[in-house]
């Protein structure tokens, strides 16, 4: 390990999910009006199930919490509402806890066709809540975090990006035709991510091993592996299965 990231090996996905959820629970107990940074995808689903359990057991309340999601598609057809990240969050977390839906924010309305918006205003909105107290991230095979693909700049802010061909192809299974797959998304930038007070990265799946190794062995940011931006932060935990 060549950096000050805290790498924690877990024996199972269940253990990884519980440990990550406990980090969130600790933050929320200490600060009931915590500002949470949330991600979509299969990796954090177990974490959200654990947070729902903690809420049901009256261990924590999300009533005063605020959330900001990492990313969202843009230019999606209305018929695919169930493919939006907003739908995912409502389905897998928000509808099962007591968070105020008015306090759950996304970088864009997925159905928006206006590609010339001030996307950086999302950063200002986060700043207006004094920043994210804790942020969960997943990681892509190529080391992307959010939709910050290889080549992303360390000082990047929330912005619209073109999805890679491999991402479009991977997503096509959720759509009737590849033509319906969104070509663009809006993502928090690397500098937006690094402003979070605590970052928890969950690494699930053998296909992520190369990216995990790149992060473990990095002393400084390498734009070929966007995840290495995390070496510039002093409060990062990485949970991985080994």
UniProtKB/Swiss-Prot annotation:
<protein>
    <recommendedName>
        <fullName>Glucosamine-6-phosphate deaminase</fullName>
        <ecNumber>3.5.99.6</ecNumber>
    </recommendedName>
</protein>
<feature type="active site" description="For ring-opening step">
    <location>
        <position position="149"/>
    </location>
</feature>
<comment type="pathway">
    <text>Amino-sugar metabolism; N-acetylneuraminate degradation; D-fructose 6-phosphate from N-acetylneuraminate: step 5/5.</text>
</comment>
<dbReference type="GO" id="GO:0005975">
    <property type="term" value="P:carbohydrate metabolic process"/>
</dbReference>
<keyword id="KW-0119">Carbohydrate metabolism</keyword>
<dbReference type="InterPro" id="IPR037171">
    <property type="entry name" value="NagB/RpiA_transferase-like"/>
</dbReference>
<dbReference type="GO" id="GO:0042802">
    <property type="term" value="F:identical protein binding"/>
</dbReference>
<dbReference type="GO" id="GO:0005737">
    <property type="term" value="C:cytoplasm"/>
</dbReference>
<dbReference type="GO" id="GO:0006046">
    <property type="term" value="P:N-acetylglucosamine catabolic process"/>
</dbReference>
<dbReference type="InterPro" id="IPR006148">
    <property type="entry name" value="Glc/Gal-6P_isomerase"/>
</dbReference>
<comment type="function">
    <text>Catalyzes the reversible isomerization-deamination of glucosamine 6-phosphate (GlcN6P) to form fructose 6-phosphate (Fru6P) and ammonium ion.</text>
</comment>
<feature type="active site" description="Proton acceptor; for ring-opening step">
    <location>
        <position position="144"/>
    </location>
</feature>
<dbReference type="InterPro" id="IPR018321">
    <property type="entry name" value="Glucosamine6P_isomerase_CS"/>
</dbReference>
<dbReference type="GO" id="GO:0006043">
    <property type="term" value="P:glucosamine catabolic process"/>
</dbReference>
<feature type="active site" description="Proton acceptor; for enolization step">
    <location>
        <position position="71"/>
    </location>
</feature>
<dbReference type="GO" id="GO:0004342">
    <property type="term" value="F:glucosamine-6-phosphate deaminase activity"/>
</dbReference>
<comment type="similarity">
    <text>Belongs to the glucosamine/galactosamine-6-phosphate isomerase family. NagB subfamily.</text>
</comment>
<dbReference type="InterPro" id="IPR004547">
    <property type="entry name" value="Glucosamine6P_isomerase"/>
</dbReference>
<feature type="active site" description="For ring-opening step">
    <location>
        <position position="142"/>
    </location>
</feature>
<dbReference type="Pfam" id="PF01182">
    <property type="entry name" value="Glucosamine_iso"/>
</dbReference>
<keyword id="KW-0378">Hydrolase</keyword>
<dbReference type="GO" id="GO:0019262">
    <property type="term" value="P:N-acetylneuraminate catabolic process"/>
</dbReference>
């Amino acid at each position: 390990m060549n950096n000050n990231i805290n790498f924690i090996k877990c024996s199972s996905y269940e253990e990884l999910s519980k440990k990550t959820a406990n980090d969130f629970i600790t933050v929320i107990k200490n600060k009931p009006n915590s500002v949470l940074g949330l991600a979509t995808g299969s990796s954090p689903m177990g974490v959200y199930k654990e947070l729902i359990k903690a809420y049901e057991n009256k261990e924590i309340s999300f009533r005063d919490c605020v959330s900001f999601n990492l990313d969202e598609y843009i230019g999606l057809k209305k018929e695919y509402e169930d493919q939006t990240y907003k739908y995912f969050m409502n389905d897998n977390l928000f509808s099962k806890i007591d968070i105020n839906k008015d306090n759950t924010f996304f970088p864009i309305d997925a159905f928006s066709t206006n590609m010339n918006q001030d996307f950086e205003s999302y950063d200002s909105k986060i700043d207006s809540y004094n920043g994210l107290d804790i942020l969960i991230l997943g990681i892509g095979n190529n080391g992307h975090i959010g939709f910050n693909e290889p080549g992303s700049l360390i000082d990047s802010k929330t912005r619209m990006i073109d999805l890679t061909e491999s991402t479009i192809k991977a997503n096509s299974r959720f759509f009737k035709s590849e033509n319906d797959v969104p070509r663009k998304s809006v993502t928090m930038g690397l500098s937006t991510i690094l402003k979070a007070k605590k970052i928890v990265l969950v690494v699930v799946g053998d296909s992520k091993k190369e990216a995990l190794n790149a992060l473990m062995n990095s002393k400084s940011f390498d734009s070929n592996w966007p995840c290495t931006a995390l070496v510039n932060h002093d409060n990062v935990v990485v949970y991985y299965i080994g």
